[in-house]
A protein has these predicted regions:
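Single conserved hydrophobic/aromatic residue that forms the stacking wall/gate
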Residues: 1-15
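Hydrophobic Val/Ile/Leu positions in short beta-strands of Rossmann-like dinucleotide-binding domains
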Residues: 13, 30-31, 179
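NAD(P)+-binding Rossmann beta1-loop-alpha1 motif at the extreme N-terminus of oxidoreductases
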Residues: 17-68
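Rossmann-fold NAD(P)-dependent oxidoreductase module
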Residues: 40, 44, 148, 193
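Rossmann-like NAD(P)-binding element
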Residues: 73, 77, 81-117, 124-129
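Rossmann-fold NAD(P)-binding glycine/threonine-rich loop
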Residues: 122-165, 169
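Active-site-lining helix/loop region of Rossmann-like oxidoreductase modules
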Residues: 175-241
């Protein structure tokens, strides 16, 4: 049997730090790395041995993002580039821009993504009703990215249900990550990266299933609004084989 357990801040975080990696790994380019999610992933993956590149629409914005990152985590090395150059430099590329900029950003860097894994964290929230599920006509933001980029890019959707600002803290996050994508090997590589960042990832099937993870975000927002828990997330439970 497999189930889903809701977790909140009082049970989701333990007072222990994640282990740091020592071996050099792929260069990770984070496009739109100015928010909590991009910053938190940069910190955690740098500790795990990845070289980090922060991309933005302009070099100045990228440099400002790196400066802000260093204020939070001075020991995290990161290079600033425009999105186009960052996508070229990254062996694995992560898209963390707001949903309204997803398509334009991907279109501008598409030629530099061929043969690579693109981790798409987009959640298609539509203000002001962010607590209501409003998926795009394509079915999900993840599927929209895959259709836009074509099969030569391995789109993997993940991180939609993580309380992003917690990633910047030096703590273990017990909330799980649902990972969808059409290539199992690409999903597995992303799951390994999730584990290196101190979380647990699960194979959740093809990119069509990204709709479920994206929709869950609005449900978690409603649960947070209840005041019973904060930073709610999910935990996959079941009997191990």
């Amino acid at each position: 049997e497999i189930g889903v357990r809701l977790v909140g801040s009082e049970m989701c975080i333990r007072d222990r730090v994640m282990s740091e990696g020592s071996n050099a790994k792929e260069t990770v380019a984070i496009l739109g790395g100015t928010g909590d999610l991009g910053t938190g992933l940069a910190i955690r993956w740098s500790k795990a041995g990845h070289k980090i590149v922060i991309g933005s629409r302009t070099l100045e914005k990228a440099q400002a993002a790196v400066a802000a990152l260093h204020e939070i985590s001075p020991e995290t090395p990161a290079e600033a580039m425009e999105n186009f150059d960052a996508a070229k430099a990254g062996e694995i590329v992560v898209l963390t821009v707001p949903a309204e900029h997803q398509e334009s950003t991907l279109s501008s860097v598409k030629e530099n993504l061929t043969g690579k894994i693109l981790i798409d964290v987009t959640v298609p929230l539509v203000p002001p009703k962010v607590g209501t599920v409003q998926l795009p006509p394509e079915g999900s933001a993840g599927k929209r990215a895959q259709e836009l980029l074509g099969e030569e890019v391995m789109v993997v959707s993940a991180f939609q249900n993580i309380a992003a600002h917690l990633l910047k803290e030096d703590i273990q996050i017990e909330c799980d990550v649902l990972v969808t994508g059409n290539k199992k090997a690409a999903r597995q590589r992303v799951i390994e990266m999730i584990e290196s960042a101190g979380m647990v990832g699960w194979h959740a099937g093809p990119i069509d299933n990204a709709a479920a993870a994206e929709a869950l975000t609005s449900i978690l927002i409603q649960i947070n609004r209840s005041g019973i828990v904060s930073h709610s997330g999910i935990k996959i439970i079941g009997q191990e084989h």
